[in-house]
């Protein structure tokens, strides 16, 4: 037996191969190792497995993965089809799978166009942007309009036959150059086998091409002016001050009652919303066997209280996160885990301390129950994702610090599960049975549409939650924005339809535009976007904040790549993002505020505007570092203080601090300005209290670091509310007029701290309780 050759250890004087990436100092003894390391900088995982969406930097690794994980398993007879019903792209003429209701001519044209891109990976030494990138992306967007599982005709009101693709869906065009896509000609007619799983995050061909985030960002900016805009004169016209709402033209008032048709805020339950006695008995038995609840807690959970908590879910939570379809959901038939997620969320909003403690106890077991359920096995059922999303929002935004931290850990599990797609066995996607006629066909088509729209809403609201927690808590986003290349949500009145007849009457509404072109329009600021619903506007805002996070990443050279390839000046990319945020606010005013469609004090409006202000703040401030600095002050931790004080001092000396301070003043004034009283216990926007806390820290840090103190505006005056209003007025005047008035009052933040402590102290959310404790210690300094 021949002995294996023993490799010689590295010796001094041997050749070292250095990484060519700018700023990297690593070197390697072998050239291939240096090349492999270089790809980690460019994130060039251009080879995508069509079976499981795994990505690789080398084609040989992809081929080995496919042979070991998919081909051999298929040859052994373990599966008749690949796990996700996707076909390996090779040199042969194999076809990418499309839903059976998509015309074959569309499939062939889209496949031919995309295959030419997929087979050519983007290498590190090649330009990020190819000459035909924009054309290819637009073609991919056009393809998703046809091939996406959730897209269906709203103009075809017939109740028989198969679903057809309307002509307008084949060409997404809203009379704007940023939304135009090429049309696709018809050539053939074929039928494909039904899928075993349904994609949640877009379709396979689109994701296979649009897998590179850097390329996507380049596409967003490729039509911009070559010279970046300059910073505008400092003022408060981009804030949420009600006095500024007359800056935009007023549109005609809506002809329908927008609030009643789009926001179902009533807590009146119909029969299907009520838990029957038999279902209630089964629920109590499951809770007694699987959830560690005391006898007192089980006795407290009466049937009438359960129905009350369900009502609060629909009244307080659903209008903000409408991903459950109330018209078709029957609580008696809902899985226990989904029902418990709804009930516990209602327990939070009902305002009862004992009910809230029971909800926290239930969530210590609920997630485990979902993970061990047979329906969680990939591809999971739709209700699994719905229950997990409700659970994550409860645990992150209302529960204890421990559950908050665990929820962030399990967030990745949920997203990874979603990548595997949605099980088709629990969704109405199959063809209409031959023996089905009349009313049954109508109901079938309605439920079919509901399943598709519900799946799309899970994708978008998961993206919103993921993006929201980036700016709230500084977490790293786990959902790549390129994976939500989907048409936006349907009109909420259509989603709220509680019968097939009501749904049919609204089907002639316009189809929603695609997310990516709309996002690009807000970044270019050149054209007024199409009329969007409040929920779609919220999705766009979170898309903009995600782009800001991508551009702020270090050592990846994204901005340099964009400038090199299309000549756009992005050195001041923060100015571009700020301009897009302001354009979003102006558009929001035109759509909803100036015409009275939504009142300024509407809870949903207040939640969106708080997110807008925090988006500006997070663009210019490391919120986590600021929180850590405040914690180091009250804990006297030298290590924490040393690591954050340098950042805070540098931040204070930069222009970033002034921008953040302005928006913090806006935020506090929106909560506590004038005679306003804030009730945190009745707050339905779960993120808003945290926005107030962050804004308070920013204003405190500005005064404390500058002057070394925190004091009352008028010593001897114990009316904190009046002193707070005087402080806000002088800060606003001084900052907007570039005067020095605010320098005198900048350290007069003691009334602010006391007022914020008073309004936030009733909160039960563990993270906010810790924040109030820090503010209380800052008062005592």
Curated annotation (Swiss-Prot):
Induction data: Abundant in nitrogen-deficient G0 cells and rapidly decreases its levels upon nitrogen replenishment.
Lineage top rank: taxon: Eukaryota
First-listed, main subcellular location of the protein, grouped into a coarse class: nucleus
GO MF annotations, alphabetized: DNA-binding transcription activator activity, RNA polymerase II-specific; DNA-binding transcription factor activity, RNA polymerase II-specific; RNA polymerase II cis-regulatory region sequence-specific DNA binding; zinc ion binding
Disrupted gene: phenotype observed: Defective in supporting the G0 state, while normal under vegetative condition.
Keywords (A to Z) from UniProt: Cytoplasm, Cytoskeleton, Metal-binding, Nucleus, Repeat, Zinc, Zinc-finger
Coiled-coil region: none
Zinc finger (C2H2-type) residue numbers: 17-41, 47-70
PANTHER family xrefs: MIP31509P (PTHR40626), ZINC FINGER PROTEIN YPR022C (PTHR40626:SF11)
Function: Required for maintaining cell viability in nitrogen-deficient stationary phase (G0) cells.
Protein name: Zinc finger protein klf1
Taxonomic lineage: Eukaryota, Fungi, Dikarya, Ascomycota, Taphrinomycotina
């Amino acid at each position: 037996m021949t002995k294996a050759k023993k490799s010689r250890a590295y010796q001094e004087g041997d050749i070292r191969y250095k990484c060519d990436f700018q700023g990297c100092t690593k070197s390697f003894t072998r050239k291939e190792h240096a090349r492999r390391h270089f790809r980690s900088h460019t994130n060039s995982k251009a080879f995508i497995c069509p079976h499981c969406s795994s990505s690789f930097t080398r084609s040989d690794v992809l081929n080995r993965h496919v042979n070991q994980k998919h081909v051999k398993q298929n040859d052994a007879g373990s599966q008749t089809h690949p796990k996700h019903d996707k076909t390996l792209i090779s040199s042969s003429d194999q076809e990418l799978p499309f839903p059976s209701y998509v015309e074959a001519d569309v499939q062939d044209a889209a496949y031919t166009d995309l295959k030419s891109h997929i087979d050519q990976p983007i290498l590190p030494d090649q330009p990020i942007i190819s000459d035909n990138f924009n054309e290819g992306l637009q073609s991919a967007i056009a393809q998703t309009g046809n091939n996406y599982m959730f897209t269906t005709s709203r103009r075809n009101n017939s109740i028989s036959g198969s679903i057809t693709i309307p002509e307008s869906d084949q060409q997404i065009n809203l009379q704007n150059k940023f939304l135009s896509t090429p049309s696709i000609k018809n050539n053939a007619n074929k039928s494909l086998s039904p899928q075993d799983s349904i994609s949640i995050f877009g379709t396979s061909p689109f994701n296979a091409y649009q897998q590179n985030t850097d390329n996507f960002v380049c596409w967003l900016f490729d039509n911009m002016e070559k010279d970046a805009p300059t910073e505008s004169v400092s003022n408060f016209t981009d804030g949420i001050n009600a006095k500024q709402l007359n800056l935009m033209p007023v549109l005609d008032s809506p002809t329908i009652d927008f609030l009643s048709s789009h926001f179902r805020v009533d807590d009146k339950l119909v029969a299907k919303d009520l838990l029957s006695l038999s279902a209630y008995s089964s629920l109590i038995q499951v809770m007694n066997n699987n959830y560690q609840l005391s006898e007192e807690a089980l006795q407290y959970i009466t049937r009438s209280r359960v129905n009350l908590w369900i009502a609060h879910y629909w009244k307080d939570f659903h209008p903000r996160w409408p991903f459950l379809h109330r018209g078709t959901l029957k609580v008696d038939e809902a899985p226990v885990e989904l029902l418990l997620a709804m009930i516990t969320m209602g327990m939070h909003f009902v305002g009862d301390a004992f009910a809230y403690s029971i909800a926290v106890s239930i969530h210590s077991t609920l997630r485990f129950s979902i993970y061990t359920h047979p329906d969680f096995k990939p591809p999971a059922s739709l209700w699994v994702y719905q229950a997990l999303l409700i659970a994550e929002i409860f645990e992150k935004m209302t529960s204890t610090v421990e559950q908050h931290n665990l929820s962030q850990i399990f967030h990745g599990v949920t997203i990874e599960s979603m990548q595997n797609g949605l099980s088709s066995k629990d969704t109405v996607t199959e063809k209409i049975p031959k023996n089905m006629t009349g009313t049954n066909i109508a109901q079938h088509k309605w439920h079919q549409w509901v399943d598709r729209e519900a799946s799309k809403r899970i994708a978008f609201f998961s993206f919103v939650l993921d993006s929201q927690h980036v700016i709230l808590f500084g977490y790293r986003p786990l959902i790549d924005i390129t994976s939500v290349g989907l048409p936006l949500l349907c009109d909420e009145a259509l989603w709220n339809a509680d019968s097939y007849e009501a749904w049919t009457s609204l089907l002639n509404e316009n189809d929603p535009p695609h997310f990516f072109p709309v996002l690009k329009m807000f970044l270019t600021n050149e054209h007024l976007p199409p009329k969007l619903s409040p929920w779609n506007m919220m999705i766009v805002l979170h898309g903009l904040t995600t782009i800001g996070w991508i551009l702020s990443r270090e050592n990846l050279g994204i901005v340099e790549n964009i400038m090199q390839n299309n000549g756009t000046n992005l050195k001041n990319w923060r100015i571009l993002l700020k301009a897009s945020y302001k354009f979003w606010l102006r558009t929001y005013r035109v759509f909803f505020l100036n015409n009275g469609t939504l009142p300024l004090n509407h809870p949903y409006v207040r939640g969106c505007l708080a997110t807008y202000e925090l988006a500006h703040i997070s663009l210019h401030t490391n919120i986590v570092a600021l929180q850590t600095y405040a914690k180091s002050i009250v804990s006297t931790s030298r290590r924490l203080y040393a690591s954050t004080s340098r950042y805070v001092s540098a931040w204070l000396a930069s222009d970033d601090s002034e921008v953040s301070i302005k928006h913090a003043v806006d935020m506090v004034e929106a909560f506590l300005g004038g005679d306003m009283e804030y009730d945190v216990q009745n707050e339905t926007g779960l993120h808003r209290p945290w926005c107030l806390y962050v804004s308070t820290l920013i204003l405190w840090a500005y005064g404390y670091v500058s002057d070394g103190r925190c004091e009352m505006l008028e010593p001897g005056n114990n009316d904190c509310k009046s002193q707070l209003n005087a402080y806000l007025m002088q800060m606003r005047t001084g900052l907007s007029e570039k005067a020095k008035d605010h320098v005198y009052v900048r350290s007069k933040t003691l009334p602010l701290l006391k007022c914020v402590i008073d309004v936030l102290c009733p909160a039960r959310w563990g993270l906010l309780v810790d924040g109030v404790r820090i503010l209380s210690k800052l008062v005592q300094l």
